[in-house]
Amino acid sequence: MKIPTTTDIPQRYTWCLAGICYSSLAILPSFLSYAESYFNPAFLLENGTSVADLSRFERGNHQPAGVYRVDLWRNDEFIGSQDIVFESTTENTGDKSGGLMPCFNQVLLERIGLNSSAFPELAQQQNNKCINLLKAVPDATINFDFAAMRLNITIPQIALLSSAHGYIPPEEWDEGIPALLLNYNFTGNRGNGNDSYFFSELSGINIGPWRLRNNGSWNYFRGNGYHSEQWNNIGTWVQRAIIPLKSELVMGDGNTGSDIFDGVGFRGVRLYSSDNMYPDSQQGFAPTVRGIARTAAQLTIRQNGFIIYQSYVSPGAFEITDLHPTSSNGDLDVTIDERDGNQQNYTIPYSTVPILQREGRFKFDLTAGDFRSGNSQQSSPFFFQGTALGGLPQEFTAYGGTQLSANYTAFLLGLGRNLGNWGAVSLDVTHARSQLADASRHEGDSIRFLYAKSMNTFGTNFQLMGYRYSTQGFYTLDDVAYRRMEGYEYDYDGEHRDEPIIVNYHNLRFSRKDRLQLNVSQSLNDFGSLYISGTHQKYWNTSDSDTWYQVGYTSSWVGISYSLSFSWNESVGIPDNERIVGLNVSVPFNVLTKRRYTRENALDRAYASFNANRNSNGQNSWLAGVGGTLLEGHNLSYHVSQGDTSNNGYTGSATANWQAAYGTLGGGYNYDRDQHDVNWQLSGGVVGHENGITLSQPLGDTNVLIKAPGAGGVRIENQTGILTDWRGYAVMLYATVYRYNRIALDTNTMGNSIDVEKNISSVVPTQGALVRANFDTRIGVRALITVTQGGKPVPFGSLVRENSTGITSMVGDDGQVYLSGAPLSGELLVQWGDGANSRCIAHYVLPKQSLQQAVTVISAVCTHPGS
């Protein structure tokens, strides 16, 4: 139930009401501050008999009791949007409450996390549909803002059940609506006598919790007297959430997890724990914070200078187990503000590696099926893989797993720990038995060491440093799948079919020996930052190795950003190893023009760019250009460049990309001394649902269907290029699973004939769902109607209801009534008292051009029913 108030009238039209309702009601507040005030109609109009029955105002700013959909907040934490029953009350529920008190039942008490068993009075009222929370729970407060439809509840921490921050009960998770889904991407290139096209699709069906998906691609090439065309089925699978197990089930094509073993493709069944189903504060690893408060105190925990946790603790020992650090490294600074003014401060060192879990947390991952790879050199043996990780006391994590196949057996055991000031570390051992393509049998071990450490004082962050050593007889499941002991995997393209591109080389006689991986960054404060990332893999029986490193420096100066990087790539069995050094500079135009940046100015959103590269073969290239964004929504990007290369002389390009409401369209023109070519790209999504078909930009894994019937051309806040179609439907992409997603219509883009009860909605989608966000729209005219009866205005303060739509309003000065969303013709029921003679009916007709006008002003005559 939603009773229209002045907040339903857009601000840009409130001028219509100045001197109507509120010019007369301006004198009311001085009376409303007293309970049971009496309104003398003579104060409002000289003729008091022309005023409706005002007894409903005599108890202050009271609103009708009923069911209202409100945003529910508990202790400043958003719980969700919910329909709640409100009753009239004389108790203090806030100055803006409209004299309403929410009714709490057991379901709502559970929703807000109240420990009902701790309060005997609640136990006695468990069957009561309208429990008075203020009387049942000491120190609880309720503040209801009727205009904002926001209910704020404050409950002492001791009265709440122990639950993690950010916890959303599974009852609120939305499996979505039945739908047909299609994601498509089509690209083409024409130049130098050649044509090439590529099309990919990801299609699916959603029915309840089940998701059916298929991924495929099509390649086409024609040129130089050669023609090729091929369709590839990349994968087909069915997926659903198993909520009681907090896990996901996948049947069909997929990939195993990579927490413990290296990830591989499979065609079979996988059941695995889903981190997404846990609150942010229970994902990954964070240390348990313990301490002792001398008094009732405020506890604050900071990481890297940012507050990540704040709560109130009772006197005595406390334990915090639901932290959600903002990064994987960075010591935790704990502050306890005692009630007597004293303060405790201490630091808990913190770093993590990927396998660390919180105490009491258990994760599993089970897979059974055929090995699946896009590499034609490999077969498809059946295998089983099972892994488990468990968080133990003292910040330990134990983990293990196994891989079983006809020609392969592997077992892994490991242990990880947060070492405080020394960082975080994990160590595991894998023992494997293998039979290779030549029928030879091997047995070996592999030891893996991972380390992470943040030294914020020096600005150094070892994001991940790893080392693995394997004995000569150690092989992986991926190795055993090869059909031959040695071979190449090629990628043929139509134009250079005689010169295939080598994408993979394997030689099982050279088993892996040791591998070092590193990812380190170093902050230089105002002077930028340095980083180094890379891996180095050695093999048995050869001096060759795989090496990839990238070292770089990034910084900025007066708005100009620049970077210098060096990369080194070298692979066993693959020629054309290369080393490249590159320089990149980007200069915003407002720096060149010395203008103050404004996002609305296209010139300020433009920038100049320059990059130069040199490789180990002595080849140089440079490119200078300009780019930026255009259009009101900044959804048209462009870039134009010109440069020179050692091989092809001059070179240049011009590209543009438009993120439209129904898809993405891009195009480009490239040229150099020897050739010219044109390329294009078209991508988007198609959603079929019970209300029709909706086109969109490329879909994400999880999406929201926006339903605002009749509200066409309305933008969605914080969504580039997305607006509702002519029917009022749109798709918001890449929704966050198992979390509240806020969807808001931009009311500034609504037409004159569109009104919406509430322009904000929130949903909690499950993995892969298409969730619908409904908006209650009113499509019609905004009208100011002067209603008269017997040649005189109907009484001031009369209630007005449009018969066909149920729109309600109130009579202001001189019989004027403001309506929004009114039909072009209708019937108004005007009532100013309880008797049959205290009502009349007015018929009205609006001109068709009213739909294009801000407000239409007309008159209507009101007659008694039956007259």
Swiss-Prot record:
A single MF term (Gene Ontology): fimbrial usher porin activity
Keyword Phosphoprotein: no
Biological-process GO terms, alphabetical: pilus assembly
Disulfide bond among keywords: yes
UniProt membrane topology term: Multi-pass membrane protein
Keyword annotations of the record: Cell outer membrane, Disulfide bond, Fimbrium biogenesis, Membrane, Signal, Transmembrane, Transmembrane beta strand, Transport
Domain of life: Bacteria
Induction: Expression is negatively regulated by H-NS and subjected to cAMP receptor protein (CRP)-mediated catabolite repression.
Cysteine-cysteine disulfides: 840-862
GO CC list: cell outer membrane
Pfam families from the UniProt entry: PapC_C (PF13953), PapC_N (PF13954), Usher (PF00577)
NCBIfam families, A to Z: PRK15193.1 (NF011740), PRK15198.1 (NF011745)
Miscellaneous section: The operon is cryptic under classical laboratory conditions, but is functional when constitutively expressed.
Protein name: Outer membrane usher protein SfmD
Name of the encoding gene: sfmD
